[in-house]
């Protein structure tokens, strides 16, 4: 018999319907479910695929460098980073007429181009790249790494080079190598680059390349202070406040500082502070990489650590006993932990990229700031929901009740009703108490009595900001109390520039907050708690619930258990994930709306618009969404087109994709099955058309698959729509 797709499942390969294709694609990466899979082969396949992932990442970043070097304007941008628009790549479109060619020819280019809103120009500039040749060199190097990764992936699939199962299960060695190798050594290497190339080359005008790399001294006395123990010398004579970035004017000689705050000209963190930070990180992680015991006999055994964690008084059962083997033998548990950590870090990156910008001049590129914040928050949302999805799969496929008797994991399952009901209460409370004031304020505005709004000052948040040095609110506490010991000690010991930065209104550090912020923070809290409720309930009920005690026998994603148990529809762990993604998107919508509107008013110098309009719903709809979409809808108008046309088209297209999602989410399997059978009947009776036959009988998607397709369209359309709105409304105002 001929081999048909999918080769990894003979059962599916023999399916006579089109289900074979869709289920084949859906389970292609679920290695655990494949025929003839063993635990060892499973680990080896995943390990080899990591090399493929790295190859794709290196190829993609290489492409960024290559296209900017080939079609961008990097060399002219660095002459005037604040006024020249950075070009991502050229556009070639045979449909372009003359008006379009003119509209998209900008940034000093000869033809139509796309503008870069990713911040790569600022990054490359800050770390010391100066010419197109530098960019080409970087692109080639990354291409080389990509090739190397592919070879590595192929090599580790060869019998001789396949790592054994015991190698994959050696958690202590892996942690040591990842901590000291991945984080420690790479942070040290980055410190080296900043000190040897970026600080002398990028910041102080001494262009460092391969040919003079060994000649340019990063510090006049070289390693002297390090070897004689006078480390404080490396912090003396920093760049002055009138330093012109990229020149020797006002430049110092310090390489590792604790200045705090921002470089007055570039509005970004001091490079010498960044180098110091990475050196500290490297030091910590190099030590941490020697923390776990391997065959050298030093350090801790993770298993011993966990077993020793017996809670005092015995009130929490057997503590962490059994956790080591549970985690070490479950890829889904490990992936869940990794995704949870990565998701949180990605969201932190979004927060810190705008509040503490690290790259020269990026803070004044408003569209890039908005795009990077939004991008990282959406990525964080998807990654965090994924963490709970794999947590649920762990409970279904990998959890062993005997191994985890009365430990923290078992006790989480034992009192899940209390956890879920408390989360439900918190979500309900936040929902009613946030929507209530918004609706009340809306009605008051509509009736012409704005003075009757419920406006609550966020005094606790303002108090926290004051403790960090913000003097606006007059709290006179800790770092905002100029007579207090904290303030005086802080001025002398650390970060003298920090307090200036906190109290300047030209950056995004500790933005002044009021009643509008108070309300939207609670709206976001509602979204976060509801998303968490759905995800936590999905994971904790994944093995079974009072309604369906045998749920784990049905697997991760099932539609229902037939008409006999009617209440079993929509309660699989997959359905919880599916519902949570809608809430996640909803929440990040509020987060990005808030961030964008507050910053637009800040950048335009009319913060009162946000303060006055953000306290009621019509304010958000009219003064944020409607007002800022006007440029967008003007991409095409009776006078022709302009450079926002592409975003206007994307805005419409995004809505179309989003709306298509509902076709899959609302009309289900029976409707489509009837339609398909009618179409197949018509096809077979139509001359010429009936010459074409298909081997598989066409059938509708399953309920779960249709939901996935609907969710994918909803998510992609939602993000496309907002991306177009965000970029067009920001670049339309600020260029």
Curated annotation (Swiss-Prot):
Q: What species is given as this protein's source?
A: Zea mays
What is the designated name of this protein?
A: Photosystem I P700 chlorophyll a apoprotein A2
> What processes in GO biological process is this protein linked to?
photosynthesis
Underlying gene: psaB
The reply to whether RNA-binding figures as a keyword in the UniProt entry is no
Could you confirm whether the keyword Thylakoid appears in this record?
yes
> What does the cofactor field's note say?
P700 is a chlorophyll a/chlorophyll a' dimer, A0 is one or more chlorophyll a, A1 is one or both phylloquinones and FX is a shared 4Fe-4S iron-sulfur center.
| Family designation | Belongs to the PsaA/PsaB family.
User: Which amino acid positions bind [4Fe-4S] cluster, per UniProt?
Assistant: 560, 569
């Amino acid at each position: 018999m001929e081999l048909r797709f999918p080769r990894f499942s003979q059962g599916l390969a023999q399916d006579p319907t089109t289900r074979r294709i869709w289920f084949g694609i859906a389970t292609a990466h679920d290695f655990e479910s494949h025929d003839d899979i063993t635990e060892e082969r499973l680990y080896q396949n995943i390990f080899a695929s990591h090399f493929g992932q790295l190859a794709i990442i290196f190829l993609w970043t290489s492409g960024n460098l290559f296209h900017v070097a080939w079609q961008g304007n990097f060399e002219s941008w660095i002459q005037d980073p604040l006024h020249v628009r950075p070009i991502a790549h050229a556009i070639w479109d045979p449909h372009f007429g003359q008006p379009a060619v003119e509209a998209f020819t900008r940034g000093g280019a000869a033809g139509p181009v796309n503008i870069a809103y990713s911040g790569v120009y600022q990054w490359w500039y800050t770390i010391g790249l100066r010419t197109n040749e530098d960019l080409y060199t970087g692109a080639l190097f990354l291409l080389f790494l990509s090739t190397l990764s592919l070879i590595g992936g192929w090599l580790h699939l060869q019998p001789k080079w396949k790592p054994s199962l015991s190698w994959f299960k050696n958690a202590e060695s892996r942690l040591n190598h990842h901590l000291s190798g991945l984080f420690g050594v790479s942070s040290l290497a980055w410190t080296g680059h900043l000190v040897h190339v970026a600080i002398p080359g990028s910041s102080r005008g001494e262009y460092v390349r391969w040919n003079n790399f060994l000649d340019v001294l990063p510090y006049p006395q070289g390693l002297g202070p390090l070897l004689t123990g006078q480390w404080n010398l490396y912090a003396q004579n920093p760049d002055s406040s009138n330093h012109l970035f990229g020149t020797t004017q006002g430049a110092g000689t310090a390489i590792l500082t604790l200045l705090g705050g921002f470089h007055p000209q570039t509005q970004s963190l001091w490079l010498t502070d960044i180098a110091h930070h990475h050196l500290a990180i490297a030091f910590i992680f190099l030590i941490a990489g020697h923390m776990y015991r391997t065959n050298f006999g030093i350090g801790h055994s993770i298993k011993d650590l966990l077993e020793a964690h017996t809670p005092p008084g015995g009130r929490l059962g057997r503590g962490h006993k059994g956790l080591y083997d549970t985690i070490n033998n479950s890829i889904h548990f490990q992936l869940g932990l990794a995704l949870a950590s990565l998701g949180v870090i990605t969201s932190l990156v979004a927060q810190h990229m705008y509040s503490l910008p690290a790259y020269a001049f990026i803070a004044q590129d408003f569209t890039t700031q908005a795009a990077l914040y939004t991008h990282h928050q959406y990525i964080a949302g998807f990654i965090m929901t994924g963490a709970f999805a794999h947590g649920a799969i762990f409970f279904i496929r990998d959890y062993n009740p005997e191994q985890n008797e009365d430990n923290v994991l078992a006790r989480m399952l034992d009192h899940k009703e209390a956890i879920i009901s408390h989360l439900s209460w918190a979500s309900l409370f936040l929902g009613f108490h946030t929507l209530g004031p918004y609706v009340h304020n809306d009605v008051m505005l509509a009736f012409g009595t704005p003075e009757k709004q419920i406006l609550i000052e966020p005094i606790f948040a303002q108090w926290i900001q004051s403790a960090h040095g913000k003097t606006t609110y007059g709290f006179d506490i800790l770092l905002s109390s100029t007579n207090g010991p904290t303030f005086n000690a802080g001025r002398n010991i650390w970060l003298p520039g920090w307090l200036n930065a906190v109290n300047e209104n030209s950056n995004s550090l500790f933005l002044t907050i009021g009643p509008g912020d108070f309300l939207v923070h609670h709206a976001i809290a509602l979204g976060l708690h509801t998303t968490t409720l759905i995800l936590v309930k999905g994971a904790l009920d994944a093995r079974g619930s009072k309604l369906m005690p045998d749920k784990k026998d049905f697997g991760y994603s099932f539609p229902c258990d037939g008409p006999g148990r009617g209440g079993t529809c929509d309660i699989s762990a997959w359905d919880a994930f599916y519902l949570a993604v809608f809430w996640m998107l909803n929440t990040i919508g509020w987060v990005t709306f808030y961030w964008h509107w507050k910053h637009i008013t800040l950048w335009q110098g009319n913060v009162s618009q946000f303060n006055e309009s953000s306290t009621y719903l019509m304010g958000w709809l009219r003064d944020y969404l409607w007002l800022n979409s006007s440029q967008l809808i003007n991409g095409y108008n009776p006078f022709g087109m302009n450079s926002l046309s592409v975003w206007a088209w994307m805005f419409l297209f995004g809505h179309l994709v989003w709306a298509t999602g509902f076709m899959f989410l609302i009309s289900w399997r029976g409707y489509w099955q009837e339609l398909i059978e009618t179409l197949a009947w018509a096809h077979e009776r139509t001359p010429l058309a009936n010459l074409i036959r298909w081997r598989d009988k066409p059938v509708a998607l399953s309920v779960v698959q249709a939901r996935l397709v609907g969710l994918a369209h909803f998510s992609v359309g939602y993000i496309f729509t907002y991306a177009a709105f965000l970029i067009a409304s920001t670049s339309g105002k600020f260029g």
